[in-house]
């Protein structure tokens, strides 16, 4: 967040539709206004002097809380945050919250607190954030501002998620769900946008916990909400988690679709998650053994040479060419870039198995008998790993043959292989005859 983002992304000089009581003919106090702007002029170059000057604004109020005191406190919160004076910042924030009942309009206070929350949320200090959100929620119990309560609770829930404190997160989720229910205890579909925010938070929790049963049910529910106009960032989160769920279940095409949708949503919202999701899209593309390059799409093409993506781009090329040496070289050279992501790391072994299988099939094709150590040398793995790979291929009928463990030889069943090809050709021929018959019947 830039220091130039004045007043937590909200300009103090804007009116915010401030309303003054009809039975009051008084204008805003000129002395207060002048003191406020004199203080504001100091904040960039002399922040400590600005704090003392803003305190004079509060002193001039003489206990009568109003617009200029509220604005002065906002500036004091911001300056203390920049100076890392967190204790003093909290004192000033609690002081500001006493103004929201009567000193400023509901609309003004909501916008201001929203912008303060967004600004403070950039902090990495988890304890500070928790204190900030909980203080806000305490103040809102009396204010009865449902929208601000909801936003603050979702931020607190996200904080608990980032800290992996799922017990506290579940309590927050329960409260959020209750706020979006009808009198019958069902989800109020009229609150679709808020429901999607809750689902997004809950879906992230179940994804990390690898609770696919609950994740699947919630994911399907989220896609059936039609009454919402969700922020693309929320839909990006939901589709990304859906992609992870499908990939773990081996549904690679569904995962590919979800990751692509997540990437587009993140791209639209300007989220840095778009590059991570593009990596997942590439991963799904390779696992589904697609010959189509994922970077051929209009949306993904601009990122093809992105430094963060380049390693995955090269990985796709070597994978599609069944170049196992190049594939392993890229993995070694870009280990920190590729393997740092836990989700990608989970599935790299599957990719290696796929590419080794393709190279293996091509390697053994001319032979009737082939030595396992020879295969191990070609695949650059140990003979024991070759045996494991061969067993899998034989069991799923990718390879027809048997392993002679004593002599360390793979014996291929060429008769069965020929028979399979003959059966496939016969099936193809029968299908052509059926098609020809259908065409003749139609013409007749």
From Swiss-Prot:
GO terms for cellular component: COP9 signalosome; cytoplasm; repressor ecdysone receptor complex. Keywords: Cytoplasm, Developmental protein, Differentiation, Nucleus, Oogenesis, Signalosome. One of its GO terms (biological process) is male germ-line cyst encapsulation. Expressed during embryonic stages 11-14 in the muscle attachment sites (apodemes); pharynx attachment to the roof of the mouth and in the epidermis of the head for the dorsal and ventral prothoracic pharyngeal muscle attachment. From stage 16 onwards expression is seen in all thoracic and abdominal apodemes. GO terms for molecular function: nuclear receptor binding; transcription corepressor activity. InterPro entries: 26S_Proteasome/COP9_Components, PCI_dom, WH_DNA-bd_sf. It is found in: Cytoplasm; Nucleus. Residues 255-417 form the PCI domain. PROSITE patterns: PCI (PS50250). Residues 1-31 are annotated as: Disordered. Pfam families: PCI (PF01399). Component of the COP9 signalosome complex (CSN), a complex involved in various cellular and developmental processes. The CSN complex is an essential regulator of the ubiquitin (Ubl) conjugation pathway by mediating the deneddylation of the cullin subunits of the SCF-type E3 ligase complexes, leading to decrease the Ubl ligase activity of SCF. The CSN complex plays an essential role in oogenesis and embryogenesis and is required for proper photoreceptor R cell differentiation and promote lamina glial cell migration or axon targeting. Belongs to the CSN2 family. Component of the CSN complex, probably composed of CSN1b, alien/CSN2, CSN3, CSN4, CSN5, CSN6, CSN7 and CSN8. Interacts with Rpn6. This is COP9 signalosome complex subunit 2. It comes from Drosophila melanogaster. The gene is alien.
């Amino acid at each position: 967040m830039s220091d130039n983002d004045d007043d937590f992304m909200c300009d103090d000089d804007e009116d915010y539709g401030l309303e003054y009581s009809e039975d009051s003919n008084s204008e805003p106090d000129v002395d207060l206004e002048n003191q406020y702007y004199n203080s504001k002029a100091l904040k960039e170059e002399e922040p400590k002097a600005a704090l003392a000057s803003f305190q004079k604004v509060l002193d001039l109020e003489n206990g009568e809380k109003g617009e200029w005191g509220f604005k002065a406190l906002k500036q004091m919160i911001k300056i203390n945050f920049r100076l890392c004076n967190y204790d003093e910042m909290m004192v000033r924030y609690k002081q500001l919250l006493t103004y929201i009942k009567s000193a400023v309009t509901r609309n003004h206070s909501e916008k201001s607190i929203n912008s303060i929350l967004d600004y403070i949320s950039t902090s990495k200090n988890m304890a500070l954030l928790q204190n900030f959100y909980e203080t806000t929620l305490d103040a809102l119990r009396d204010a009865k501002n449902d929208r601000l309560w909801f936003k603050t609770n979702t931020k607190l829930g996200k904080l608990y998620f980032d800290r992996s404190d799922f017990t506290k997160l579940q309590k927050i989720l329960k409260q959020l769900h209750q706020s979006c229910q009808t009198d019958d205890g069902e989800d109020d579909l009229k609150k679709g946008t808020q429901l999607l925010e809750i689902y997004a938070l809950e879906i992230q929790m179940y994804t990390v916990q690898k609770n696919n049963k609950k994740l699947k049910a919630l994911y399907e529910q989220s896609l059936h909400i039609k009454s919402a106009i969700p922020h693309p960032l929320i839909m990006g989160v939901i589709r990304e988690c859906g992609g992870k769920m499908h990939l773990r279940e081996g549904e690679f095409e569904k995962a590919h679709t979800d990751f692509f949708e997540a990437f587009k949503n993140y791209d639209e919202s300007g989220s840095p998650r778009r590059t991570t999701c593009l990596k997942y899209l590439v991963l799904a593309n390779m696992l589904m053994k697609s010959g189509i390059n994922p970077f051929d799409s209009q949306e993904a093409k601009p990122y093809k040479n992105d430094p963060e993506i380049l390693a995955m781009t090269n990985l796709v090329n070597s994978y599609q060419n069944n170049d196992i040496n190049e594939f392993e070289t890229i993995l070694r050279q870009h280990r920190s870039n590729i393997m740092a992501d836990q989700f990608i790391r989970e599935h790299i072994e599957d990719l290696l198995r796929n590419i080794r299988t393709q190279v293996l099939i091509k390697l053994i094709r001319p032979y009737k008998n082939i030595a396992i150590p020879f295969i191990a040398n070609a695949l650059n793995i140990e003979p024991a790993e070759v045996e494991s790979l061969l067993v899998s291929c034989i069991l799923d009928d990718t390879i027809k043959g048997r392993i002679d463990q004593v002599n360390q030889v793979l014996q291929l069943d060429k008769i069965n292989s020929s028979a399979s090809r003959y059966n496939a050709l016969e099936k193809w021929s029968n299908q052509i005859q059926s098609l020809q018959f259908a065409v003749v019947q139609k013409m007749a």
